[in-house]
Amino acid sequence: MSDSPTTAHTRLELPIDIIRIQALLPHRYPFLLVDRILELDQKQKRIVAQKNVSINEPFFQGHFPEHPVMPGVLIIEALAQAGGVMTQLNLSHNGHSSLLFYMVRVDNARFNKQVVPGDILILDMTMKRRIRNMGCYYGEARVNGEVVACADIMCAGVKS
């Protein structure tokens, strides 16, 4: 894996920080769920990202106030966003960065353990295949090396 992946417009050094992530994803607070990119292997089509889970997350106000737990659907969304960063880097490298990707399918989702404030969620996404404007990914979310959630995720690109 290279420590300095390149795109058509800029040279990126790992880790990729939140400012660069915001340049690649359309999401913003409170729905931007990726804080840092730790690893990027464009040959293996794999990315590892980080989400720092804070008690200040708005979803903890109602899920659940007395026992805050990160909703599983948001863990899946965080995985999809990590995959989105990888896809956007690949597209911008190939001159096709005008697509906006939407999650269109989730299969085989499993939630093995709760994610709570203070956890560091590691998001590991691998692109399994790409068919035209569709990307199929497998993702695992880990806390302290333990898989807390996993899923097969499909996203579709639409011209923005």
Curated annotation (Swiss-Prot):
Q: Which UniProt keywords apply?
A: Cytoplasm, Lipid A biosynthesis, Lipid biosynthesis, Lipid metabolism, Lyase
Q: Where is the active site?
A: H63
- Name the GO cellular-component terms: cytoplasm; membrane
Q: Which GO terms describe its molecular function?
A: (3R)-hydroxyacyl-[acyl-carrier-protein] dehydratase activity
Primary location class:
cytoplasm
The record's EC number reads 4.2.1.59
Q: Pfam families under this entry?
A: FabA (PF07977)
- Its domain of life reads Bacteria
The family classification in the record reads: Belongs to the thioester dehydratase family. FabZ subfamily.
Primary role: Involved in unsaturated fatty acids biosynthesis. Catalyzes the dehydration of short chain beta-hydroxyacyl-ACPs and long chain saturated and unsaturated beta-hydroxyacyl-ACPs.
Name used for this protein in its record: 3-hydroxyacyl-[acyl-carrier-protein] dehydratase FabZ
Source organism of the structure:
Xylella fastidiosa (strain Temecula1 / ATCC 700964)
Starting at the broadest rank, the lineage of the source organism is: Bacteria, Pseudomonadati, Pseudomonadota, Gammaproteobacteria, Lysobacterales
The coding gene here is fabZ
